[in-house]
Amino acid sequence: FLYGLGASVGSLALTSLLRAEEAGLKPHKGHHSAPAKRCIFLMMEGGPSHIDTFDPKPELTRRHLQAFNRGGEQESAMSSGKRYFVQSPFEFIKAGQSGADICTEWVHLKEMVDDMCFYRGAQVESVNHPTACYHVNTGNRFGGDPAVGSWVTYGLGSQNQNLPGFVVLPRTSYPQGGAANWSNGYLPAHFQGTPLRPQGSPILDLNPPEGVTRNRQRANLDLLAKLNGKHLATREGRTDLEARMASYELAYRMQMEVPGILDFD
């Protein structure tokens, strides 16, 4: 990742560009005071079902083991064959002063429900995993729109200009649908997510190649920045080129910052 990036401020024009790019990631002040400074979004593909955790379905219990028929709707390969309603195997209780519904298996979490907000209005229009993942992460089952992390970064900015404002932490592998789940969509390219590797070094090439000193790397990146600046001068409005140039400088700063941030020993 970092080896393919790399550069800095090689000219006055590029300096101005990078300042503009960084301004998009700096903390923003909205119309109202925002108590949230960061967002952790858990996309648990294959995680516990909502009907087994926080969303009891009494009607599902009443119809337990009755045959399921879509009646009148077009059948698909995934809906063919016999299907049955199946109730949750867990019991639910009303917890906290709010009386929130929660599964009895959440022994400790039930003590915190008054500090939680439950949203039960989400629906998805696809039975396929990739399109369903796109819908959850971007709001569009066909992908192509900005991911939720891109919108949060766009709205809040980042408090640390030496690190990406939006990082992705895949557990063992990418979710179905791949990198489109953290795409910037039609937002400027620097709002896209930066994945960290789940195994080994979270980010590759945190150190320059053997035999390349920091000073030499700096000189190489400055030259690359100068050449990229000339290339961009004839292609105004190309946010992908602008973001790539800004990412070179970010990558260089990350080489200094990331080792300490990601050292959990």
What are these regions (language model features)?
Residues 1-265:
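Ligand-binding pockets and gating/stacking loops
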